[in-house]
């Protein structure tokens, strides 16, 4: 799992210089990840002329990178798909980008493959998962699909602490998708 910051915490006491350095390193990490996400999803001249970048994505790597660009430009939030300011969570960004239905499902698979196991405090209880499955069945939904979406929501709301970490997760997922030919 990626640490929240590449700068380690001091062993004892409060080291103000180390805290400032860690904060600056995190800001730089966020800026690098944001710039990389924007650059990866920037359409080429040919794509702009043919408007290919506006068509639904048929490759999961393209879909994921477009979602990362949405997060990099509109902003990232927690707890809701899209907030009042227009910022998106991971699932909200995936929904905001046009993609074929099968592509969206494959994108979820690649994002889950890029995720690390959540910390114990972020894992829902067995009773909660049973209730989630029962509610999904009552609404005619596939419980396994609901759980997959739930895993991504947990990573967005609890597991990832910064926009840089979220964008790096999406870039890892896009790289996994590309290596799989998707």
What do the predicted segments below correspond to?
Residues 1-87, 96-182:
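Domain-length accessory/inserted modules outside core catalytic folds
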Residues 93:
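Extended, charge-enriched "interface" segments that sit outside catalytic cores
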């Amino acid at each position: 799992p990626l640490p929240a910051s590449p700068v380690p915490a001091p062993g004892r006491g409060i080291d103000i210089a180390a805290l400032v350095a860690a904060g600056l390193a995190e800001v730089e990490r966020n800026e690098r990840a944001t710039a990389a996400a924007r650059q990866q999803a920037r359409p080429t001249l040919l794509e702009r002329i043919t408007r290919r970048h506006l068509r639904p994505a048929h490759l999961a790597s393209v879909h994921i990178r477009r979602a990362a660009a949405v997060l990099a430009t509109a902003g990232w939030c927690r707890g809701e798909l899209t907030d009042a300011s227009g910022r998106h969570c991971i699932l909200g960004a995936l929904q905001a980008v046009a993609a074929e239905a099968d592509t969206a499902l494959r994108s979820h698979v690649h994002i889950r493959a890029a995720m690390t196991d959540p910390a114990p405090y972020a894992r829902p209880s067995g009773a909660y998962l049973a209730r989630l499955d029962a509610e999904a069945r009552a609404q005619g939904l596939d419980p396994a699909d609901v759980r997959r979406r739930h895993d991504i929501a947990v990573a967005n709301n609890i597991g990832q602490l910064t926009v840089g970490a979220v964008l790096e997760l999406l870039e890892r997922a896009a790289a996994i998708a590309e290596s799989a030919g998707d």
